[in-house]
Structure formats: C-alpha cells, structure tokens
Amino acid sequence: IVDDQKRPMFDSGSAVLKPYMRDILREVGSALLDVENKISLDGHTDRSPYSNDGRGYSNWELSADRANASRRELVSAGMPDEKLVRVVGMASSLLLEPDNPLSPSNRRISILVMTKEAEERLLGGERVAVDTETEPPTPSILPPKPALR
C-alpha cells in the first residue's frame, strides 16, 4: 500500500503504524469485507540495517511485526481473523524502490487478495500426480571397488 502522498507507513526501525496509515487500513479493510477471497499480508523494511550487534532482532522480525501490527488494525476494524490466511515478514527482499533501497517508501505492507487457486496451493499444498503403475527400479548390489594403492 502506498498513499498518494508517498508517505512512509512506519518510522525507521518501528512497527508502530502512522496515524494516517490506521485510517487507510480501516478503509481498505472495509472494502475487503465484501470480497470472498482470503488475504495475504506482507511486511517490508528498507535496507537500513537494524542495529542489534548482529544478534536477535533484525529487519526480518521488524517486517513481521509490521505485518502483524497491520493485521491487528484490520481485525480491530472488523475484518474476520480467518479471512487473513498468511501474515509474513519479507525484510528488504522486495523493495518498492530498488534503486533507492533506503527510501522510506520501502517501509510498507503489501495486501494481496488471493485467487482461489493460490489459496488452495497455500492451504492444501499443491497436488502432484504420482505414477502408481510403473514398477520401481529393482535395487542392485554393485561389486566393491578395488582399494587404491
């Protein structure tokens, strides 16, 4: 989601939604209530490294926290929790502005309305046809290799 003024959804290093983002999410959430399809929610960060001495909390956790903060806002606005089928953090792996990886507009969420096929693949696993009529190869025992001298 990017608003028409290209404001960031989050401050740098924060998972707290900006007040205008709460309003936008409530509007988007209301519009999605009438859609039958399930929703996937992704959180994103810019490429600024999260300062934590290389341990623990990183842009991966931050992006997941952003996705969950957005999920909580959508649910508090009336979206049924079961409508959200996936909430995930993407860190800086899918930048909105790849030519400007530190751009504040990269600090965002993505809301995807899933097709029925994508939902089935995600929830039920993709079914793969297995050939049950072909005989498996017969195991064979190979002679031992001569020792190298």
Go through each PLM region and give its residues.
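Periplasmic OmpA-like peptidoglycan-binding domain that tethers envelope proteins to the cell wall
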Residues: 11-19, 44-124, 135-149
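Mid-length scaffold segments of soluble, non-membrane domains
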Residues: 3, 14-34, 38-41
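Proteins with a high burden of low-complexity, intrinsically disordered sequence enriched in S/T/G/P/A and R
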Residues: 1-3, 137-138
